């Protein structure tokens, strides 16, 4: 896991989210992926168990490097196989701040987890308690685990 400190890379990632996914914090339709996706509603807050289920799915489906994006906070390049602890944080002495790795549940902010090749992703909305899933294999895996994750499927769209 590493914090994305390269401002140009950070900006390119968020520019792609805004331009290609039509991300907006102001609109009813807050994210519009240009590929097939499924929308779920969270039935409850996720704990360490649900976070681990999602991480196991990402290890299987996404494989190697992914982006972990926390709206207006640090963003990361990570590998799900690192098994980063639930609600992980550490003190970054170089930047003199505490760094928080986002949980898969969007606990207070938008949390996005996207494969580095942009083929699969989890996009969480904090106030609407929604999860948008992209990528056929990830969509199927989340669908299969929906009961354990306490997710209600709202729609599938293209």
Segments from the language model and where they lie:
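Structured alpha/beta or helical-core interaction and ligand-binding surfaces enriched in interleaved
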Residues: 1-158
